[in-house]
Amino acid sequence: MSKTNKSKSGSRSSRSRSASRSRSRSFSKSRSRSRSVSRSRKRRLSSRSRSRSYSPAHNRERNHPRVYQNRDFRGHNRGYRRPYYFRGRNRGFYPWGQYNRGGYGNYRSNWQNYRQAYSPRRGRSRSRSPKRRSPSPRSRSHSRNSDKSSSDRSRRSSSSRSSSNHSRVESSKRKSTKEKKSSSKDSRPSQAAGDNQGDEAKEQTFSGGTSQDIKGSESSKPWPDATTYGAGSASRASVSDLSPRERSPALKSPLQSVVVRRRSPRPSPVPKPSPPLSNASQMGSSMSGGAGYQSGAHQGQFDHGSGSLSPSKKSPVGKSPPATGSAYGSSQKEESAASGGAAYSKRYLEEQKTENGKDKEQKQTNADKEKLKEKGGFSDADVKMKSDPFAPKTDSEKPFRGSQSPKRYKLRDDFEKKMADFHKEELDEHDKDKSKGRKEPEFDDEPKFMSKVIAGASKNQEEEKSGKWESLHTGKEKQRKAEEMEDEPFTERSRKEERGGSKRSESGHRGFVPEKNFRVTAYKAVQEKSSSPPPRKTSESRDKLGSKGDFSSGKSSFSITREAQVNVRMDSFDEDLARPSGLLAQERKLCRDLVHSNKKEQEFRSIFQHIQSAQSQRSPSELFAQHIVTIVHHVKEHHFGSSGMTLHERFTKYLKRGNEQEAAKNKKSPEIHRRIDISPSTFRKHGLTHEELKSPREPGYKAEGKYKDDPVDLRLDIERRKKHKERDLKRGKSRESVDSRDSSHSRERSTEKTEKTHKGSKKQKKHRRARDRSRSSSSSSQSSHSYKAEEYPEEAEEREESTSGFDKSRLGTKDFVGPNERGGRARGTFQFRARGRGWGRGNYSGNNNNNSNNDFQKRSREEEWDPEYTPKSKKYYLHDDREGEGSDKWMGRGRGRGAFPRGRGRFMFRKSSTSPKWAHDKFSGEEGEIEDDESGTENREEKDSLQPSAE
């Protein structure tokens, strides 16, 4: 039903928005009301729409203290309160200027314009559903009455719009206020139309069941249809337990149930949007117990609303004057819906019977019918509803009519008469109680409905109640005793449903007297209807209530009990009915007392019983689980001795172990020195020995311990280079020995390079090494590494390079290179190589030409892990490419690269930058290659001489 309501209230919401706005404005019963609604809503919506539609928001609805009202984000640092209107960019000093001044529309730049929804200024009070709050402060401030009526109207429309429980509650509140007003208004026009119809209007407005009374007298014949339909729709809406009265308007409630929201005040703002849907949804929800109750309550509202709204649509026959028609169209609807609604009712009853088709429900339906007879005409629709969900309408209707129809009609006629008098009293008391009722608006929802219907119904019904309740009592008691055992678990659920239903119907019934009665009646009807267990509970509560009704302790009983109580209390509730709020307040108290006393009785009895039943219910699965758990614990205790170690100790042990291992690794690791001491001299000192010695040790160890520790550490690269350079040195040496590879590299770099590399590869290698070393030495003490490397033959150099020590020297010389090109490239060469590969190959040809022999030999190594040298480059692509290609690219790119080289590459930068050759080669390119080859050879020779001296 909520979906139906939502769809309906979707259409209705637009309609209701326009209707409740326009209706509030144009149609509204009281223009002040509608204007306040429309003003409050206009402000809300206009602020919303304005904020959304670029209207100047600077002073839009200053809802919040200006402290928080950052004037639409004029500038947070300027202080919210400053009259500095946010100057967006592109605007001069025009606070909310025209388009060019940046003040277009919202006068704020777009990026800040639309944060108003979130701005403290709006304080989120303008939520997507702006100020739909039931006591909307604005509406309240405008006028209390206007709040109740027009604000209720706006809220009702908003509730139609949102069709949320909250809105429904609000809508019921509005309806209750509207029903009060419209019952006063409508009952006045109705009384003008005829006292009976005025009462009908009142009762339809107030108790929807008035239409039942009206129909009892006016449409006794349609009423059976209406009762049939009412039973069907009541069963569908299961909330309209008043349905003969309430349901007569709601007979079309399938369609109208959603519409009911605007039930009394609004003739047909949302004429029955989708009867089957609303019935189906109502039926489904009523089937679902609490949901059913809620839907029933909403149907009650909607049925009234539909009765009033959709009578024009569904049953244009205007039995009741259209003025009262909003609430009284329910009579028309009853008539037309008696026939049309009977089909719905039958269909829905059959559906419900299929869904909830339980003979038990039929039994309860009979009992409920009897009880509902006693309860009042509305009760028989309620009974029908109760029985109908489970029994076909005809089945439930037949016993219903047979047992209840005469009495029901009698009750209806009496009820009409009494309701006419009662409504007159109510109108008087309504004015009296309005002050009271406003004070107690929280009780508006239920008490009014219950009081109104119950007052009349209790007058008629109390006479018959004692006997009927007793009979119902006995029948229900039997049923209940039979079902009591089953009801135990359900009673709790039913109570919950009842509570939820009562809450919903309290809120939802506000403008819905039948709902009040329904709540009392439909409470159980819905619960019975929603599930056979809830009906059991309903029967239980009705038995209890029956006894209570006999005691006329209406508080602790359903509306029947209330009606029993009505003589004592319902008269006050008649007054309360007359004045919506006071009536609602007192009646809500009564409802609370009744609901809670019933609930309490049920709860206390059924809670304890339910606890037992719950335990028994729990036993199969819960006890089994408990049993398994017990077994597990037992087995663990007896068969698996605990180590006596706590989890903390256990995990601490692991942590300690890990820490010890880490400490040992750190102690062992010379990488710490490398990490800490990155100076080339340190590398030189540690380099050959440590790196060479460590290269086997460090690779795994370092790789695991240190590399893990410092992922950016060059040690990873160094390690891999060491490993790969050692391998590569072997390969590289063979390659080194082969200048052709160097030449191939140089070919890659340049054919000139290759030629030059071949020509003076060894000499140039030495010179380049010397140069590289001298550069690196000039750049840093790494030249000593270079010198060492130079001291060694190229192969030795390559070995050194391949060795971690040489790698270190290379690191020193070509900082990035050392780490990068530990693969056994000559340091100087590798400097250039690292540069040279990227550079040497293409950019750094100069050094490559000079280095080409060394670089090529090294590059043979380089190749090996060069990207060029696929095996290594692929294998260690990350490190090798980063090292070799990365370093070379990095060097070649101008130190751009070298995540790894950077650690040592920094030195390289210094060294390489210090080395004129490096800088020159870096930019020399192929041209520079030749120059570098010549000048580089000279420089390298010089540097080689310098390096030996330095070393």
From Swiss-Prot:
The modification Dimethylated arginine is found at residue 17. It comes from the Eukaryota. Residues 1-13, 82-94, 157-166, 305-322, 337-346, 548-558, 776-786, 844-854 have a biased composition (Low complexity). It is found in: Nucleus; Nucleus, Nucleoplasm; Nucleus speckle. Residues 1-94, 117-558, 660-951 are annotated as: Disordered. One of its GO terms (cellular component) is nucleoplasm. Residues 204-220 have a biased composition (Polar residues). Keywords: Acetylation, Activator, ATP-binding, Biological rhythms, Isopeptide bond, Methylation, mRNA processing, mRNA splicing, Nucleotide-binding, Nucleus, Phosphoprotein, Receptor, Transcription, Transcription regulation, Ubl conjugation. The modification Phosphoserine is found at residues 220, 233, 238, 240, 243, 248, 253, 257, 315, 320, 326, 339, 379, 403, 405, 466, 532, 557, 559, 572, 616, 619, 669, 679, 681, 695, 860, 924, 935. This is Thyroid hormone receptor-associated protein 3. It comes from Mus musculus (Mouse). The gene is Thrap3.
